[in-house]
């Protein structure tokens, strides 16, 4: 390991590659300061899947990407969409900075109210429940939250088990009810795998909705968003819940997720926003 000063002494010309993710303001500010003096690039490696957002990928999927772009509900969403593509292709931070906006703005789109039946898919330790409570001023009809990783679920119960009208489920979400092997040693990035070590009970959105017609769904399920959405087609078609869907885990999320939401219910208005994060994580679809 060498310091920046040592690198400057050893090399007259160099490029800095950032190979970690952060949303810590001080760290992001340091990266921005480095960019003023040096060429700084962020290699785009998807959280899930093996695709790379390169020229051949754009050629293969160009038509579907343009179709998704045309589904965006406002000009800001289209700008975010374009800048996300530019960033994924080039790794240049200027595109990332150009697409940033606050969570407050995104939740103005959702316009949550005191009668929401909230479904939190990927609840972790309860931070997104806190976010929901913030934007509903602690007034809601019900909360249903799923977290499959046993140790994390225990912390979720400790943090949120006393909330009124709240159901916490130690389950994963999938396109149908079954049992799947689950990689449970990755913390927040836990994934469903074919060669995992832990059996997890899975349920679909439509199965959960037999008891509660959810009005708002937040989904951050580490790369299986497309599969999970396909298990909620009936609820989306018949009741059109508000959606807050992570769309950055796989390269194909940028076009497949808007397409499946539109197919479920063409009346959805689909917005895209990116919140401060390096690399292009915390990029979500907000659908109403």
Regions found by a protein language model. Give the residues of each.
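Phosphate/nucleotide-binding beta-alpha loop and adjacent structural elements of enzyme active sites
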Residues: 1-288
